Amino acid sequence: GFLPFVKKTCSYQKSKIKGIFADKSYLSYWTNDFDFGNAKPKSPVTSVSWFAAKKYCECQGKRLATMDEWEYVAMADTKKIDARTKKEFNEYILSWYEKSRTYENEIGKTFKNYWGVYDMHGLVWEWTYDFNSIFLSGESRKDKSTDKNLFCGSGSVNASDLMDYAA
């Protein structure tokens, strides 16, 4: 878990993390370096910087998934590798955005997908290794190579094809 990681890795404790690696919201609901306050022990850890998530994975001998890897695994339901054409699958994913405080739910309680992975949808947004590989700025608006169909969160409301959004 994340608590043993911060106990072992002092530089990622709430009171010791450098501003370059996290903003002031880092572990904001924790009452101190080792107490996660009112959060449930089996709920996902939130308010974690990309640097902390990356370091946590490295300490486990793992790495963050790339955006492509995450999306590939996320498009699977319990029986199909690619369930994006299934109406009920898309409705389930999109209904998650209507729910509040999903970060309080217990991990491992959403469906286990085709790959044996739980909680791909229904808890929290997750960091990916290359989350910043698409950078849009005022200067990139005329860039022909940038995918103009990238959007997140409520940006899906007016999407022409919600299937592109759900996974």
Where are these regions (language model features)?
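Short capping motifs at secondary-structure boundaries
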Residues: 1-15, 60-62, 77
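Intrinsic disorder/low-complexity segments enriched in polar/small residues
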Residues: 8, 14, 19, 88-92
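Compositionally biased, intrinsically disordered low-complexity segments
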Residues: 9, 20, 134-138
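Core domains of carbohydrate- and sulfate-ester-processing enzymes
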Residues: 14-31
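Functional-site microenvironments in short loops/helix caps that host divalent-cation chemistry
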Residues: 27-166
